[in-house]
């Protein structure tokens, strides 16, 4: 608690300090948000958003989106994978997908390609901008963005030759190499860009039984191509192709909660994704602009782990006690977003700007879930579950925006969506799963006002939604085999200060969200002597609420020093629960992975000669891991440091992540594992320890 108030006090003091220095002559660049229905300067956006630009990503990150998560208010992730897949915004999101069909609450896009629920391909090299929209995106994105949206955009082709290369070496066997090359015509009619990167690391764990330090290793390759082509004065095309091959090990858990594991069958966490997106923009004279974004993606995912985290030598007289689980998954998506944007010079009734769109998404996923076991009670054996899931979403949406006088703007949007989903598996031959059809409506109503030079306030009322889904397993009762949609109402008010030629940018917001027919994820261990004998299911509870505040500040003190910081407070609760949920005693309790506070602060120095440095401090409060038990994390803070020298096209930097080697957990389980009594106890997935590294960059053009 002292840590919480210390950092919030520091943040507040920095606001006062920066306000007194607004007359400084250093300026910050304008930020444009692109993940919204139409590109818009951040000052004019009537909702909460965090934007990390190219320089911030390069200074604060090393390899993956995971490296910069701490900079974003009210964003968390559930570990249990080698890289983040499951995110929570403002306390809402998934914690895992051990069984069943995909049903994300947080949308995840990379260059217009949908990776919601499978966001491991989010490597950082050559990233141009990361945008995180908090709150329901009921008009723009619908069912996959109940809690918000994460959008990553990589560098586009330029108008001249560009070359960028990078090599990294670090402790724990880490090494990486990357190159980006591109060219384009001076007029911007034609341009291309190619990217290749490979990253390897031992992965911060030591398997004492196998005497190996790479069982939790990272092996990540990224390949991407982009083409920009202006076919005519009225038509342009942008094509993105990507291939990301992640072949990571997974051996993170230990019976004594340390970085030393004892697995005899280490797992893997692999994802091979291929994706393509084609964006066409056509000018239609007298009407406006027609935009078409077509995207396809295919991901093959292999996830496995040692179920008992041990070996027969470790278990001694209780051996054999050996479990292993693997899940081989294949996902395909096809999406089309067709949008007509009215010509700003030909507004309706002299003042109303408009747009309308049609969206469709088709997703198919097949799974092979396999359990292998050998113990004193059941002997040796295995079981398999094969499943298929498909869902088709079709949505119509539209938006109107009008000026109310010289300073105020009002906007409204609506989205009507239908989802048809079907699930079948090898265990449902006698009682097939019913086909599920959901009809959902979302939208927003916003008012914004320019209160002064560079000062904006806004109020937004929004409604989001999320489709229903399926529960699997022979232990699931017939009436529990499916669950219904969830909806969410949100009201938010905020203030932004983005005065031109000012060294300061500030944004704050306060929000309240009420969840209806809230989807709650539960798990239960069925046999104390079997660590894989679990049933996982989701049910609709009565209600929930999530409310809090968020603030971000960037202040360029002078041409050498810059300060940036963020802070968020969050309160989440289950409300009016009954039945099974009442038996769990969760009424009024916080929701999982919803820390009560989160903060970040960064100090940057840039000397005219070329020396530079950046110190980051990030942290968050404690949170519950799961609804089914009362285990919580501990509050923590982490420091990262980077310093180096830039000369011409060359940059060399030395960096340290987790500078003071903080020990904290990022995930926790509570169950019976250790013989002979198999009593329930807490097991923790420890975060990465301190790591030192050196990175050298060469860049010609941008």
Task: Please provide the spans of the model-predicted regions.
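Gram-negative outer-membrane beta-barrel transporters
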Residues: 341, 355-357, 403-410, 418, ...
